[in-house]
Amino acid sequence: LGKRTQVGVVQCKDAFYGQHSPERMPVSYELLNKWEAWKRLHVKASEMESAALFVVADALNCRCGSCFHVVWNQEREKAGLDQDMSEDTTSAVQVGVEALKRLIQADRAAQ
């Protein structure tokens, strides 16, 4: 499809503002330390939805994957770098659909 992609570990969390405004939280020191740890571990992104999908998939004994559309990068912003912001999720949907097609083809070929 010619899309720019990255593959790697993504952190799934339960609190949006804990990441984006950690200094406002009662456990700010803990949130800031964890964020530094995620960065040192080269985690690609942080999101809030996929953990539930992976848990349900495991409970149902089926496969699960995720494809993310990056809206903005807070580390680039902190460094004063340009943000290539886009809320158009069309590319992420296209990649996800193509990935599913390829998984189905591979499964059928293996039977």
Question: Where are the language model's segments positioned?
Answer:
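Glycine-rich phosphate- or other oxyanion-binding loops that anchor nucleotides, phosphorylated ligands
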Residues: 1-111
